[in-house]
């Protein structure tokens, strides 16, 4: 069942690329269908990921929500960095 779900997702991404390339839609989308498809497929393969919100303890930048970095605001060598803008 899991393999079938994955194949359906891949087919959906490929069909979306095909439609975007052949449609008269946005030129930006026409120029970058492969890049978009690659990022989307990569996200689908990783699955749903919870991000760490602002001002919550973190260990590295990748776990923070978008536009946030894992850093300290008080001292450079702190032991408890948090996700901050």
Swiss-Prot record:
The modification Pyrrolidone carboxylic acid is found at residue 50. Expressed by the venom duct. Contains 4 disulfide bonds. GO terms for molecular function: ion channel inhibitor activity; toxin activity. InterPro entries: Conotoxin. GO terms for cellular component: extracellular region. Keywords: Disulfide bond, Pyrrolidone carboxylic acid, Secreted, Signal, Toxin. It is found in: Secreted. Residues 1-23 form the signal peptide. Residues 24-49 form a propeptide. The keyword Signal applies. Its main location: secreted. Belongs to the conotoxin O2 superfamily. The cysteine framework is XV (C-C-CC-C-C-C-C). This is Conotoxin Cap15b.
